Amino acid sequence: MAHTKAGGSTRNGRDSRGQRLGIKLGDGQFCTAGSIIFRQRGTKIFPGVNAGRGNDDTIYALITGYVKFERRRNRVYASVYPTRVQNSTSAE
């Protein structure tokens, strides 16, 4: 009899998509109120001036303006200013 034996089953074969975390708006970019600036798990970047932090630690803009990343006290802060800020201490 020319039968093929039953093939074994596998427990592999799935791959979840990435969570799409990271920076969404760069330093100096224009944003509107409510725009997501940085998606993260934990507080890698902290909310600065005119920026808020969501339940999932997402940093978002509270006003319409320009994004500015600042380094203060060994932390990186994402702020939003109504006018463009010229500062050499940007950290990204």
UniProtKB/Swiss-Prot annotation:
A cellular component annotation (GO) from this entry: cytosolic large ribosomal subunit
Keyword field contains Ribosomal protein: yes
GO biological process assignments: translation
Region (Disordered): 1-22
NCBIfam families in alphabetical order: L27
GO terms, molecular function: structural constituent of ribosome
Xref: SUPFAM superfamilies: Ribosomal L27 protein-like (SSF110324)
Spans traversing the lipid bilayer: none
Family, similarity comment: Belongs to the bacterial ribosomal protein bL27 family.
Record-given protein name: Large ribosomal subunit protein bL27
Pfam families listed in its UniProt record: Ribosomal_L27 (PF01016)
Keyword terms of this UniProt record: Ribonucleoprotein, Ribosomal protein
Coiled coil, from the record: none
